[in-house]
Amino acid sequence: MPSASIKKIIPCSKKDLINMILDIEKYPEFVPWCLSGKIHRKDDRPDMIEMEADLTVGKQFLNQTYTSHVTYYKDKGKILVNNIGGPLKHLENMWEIREINNQSEVHFKIDFEIKNIIYNMIMKKSFDLGLKKIADAFEDRAIKLYTK
C-alpha cells in the first residue's frame, strides 16, 4: 500500500490555497492524469465543508473513476479525503495548511491501495515520481493564480 508525506511552503494565503484544493472540478486543468472532476454533494456549515466528489484519473487505456468523501475543518485548516467507491480498496489523504507570513505551509499525507493487483503493482513502481508531479502541479497552480 503506497504512502507518503510531503511538506512545502507555497507563496499564497491559506484561504486561497484551501479554495483551490476544494475546487475539485478544476483539477483536470492542472493535475497530471486527472481527466475529470465532479462534485455531487456539498454541505457548507459554519465549522466545516463536506463534499462527495468523483475523480477520473488515468492515462491512455488505464483510467478509473473513484468517489471520495472530502471534509474541510475550517478551524484547523485540515482537509481529509476518504475513498467511498470505485477501484480503490483504501484511500486516506490529508492536507494540513498553516499560514506563515502570508505564505502557506502545506503538509500533505496520502495512503492508498488499489483493488486490482496489477494496477497496484504499476502504481507502486511510479508512485514517488507521480506524487512529486502532482504536488508540483498544485504548487505551480497556486503560484499562477495567486502571485503577481
Q: Predicted regions: what is each one?
A:
Residues 1-48, 102:
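Hydrophobic ligand-binding cavity/cleft-lining segments
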Residues 114-148:
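A conserved amphipathic terminal alpha-helix motif
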Residues 17-21, 27, 53, 70, ...:
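Hydrophobic pocket/interface hotspot
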Residues 20-23, 49-54, 75-81:
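Short Pro/Gly-enriched beta-strand edge/turn motifs at strand-loop
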Residues 28-29, 36, 41-43, 56-105, ...:
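Hydrophobic-ligand binding "helix-grip"
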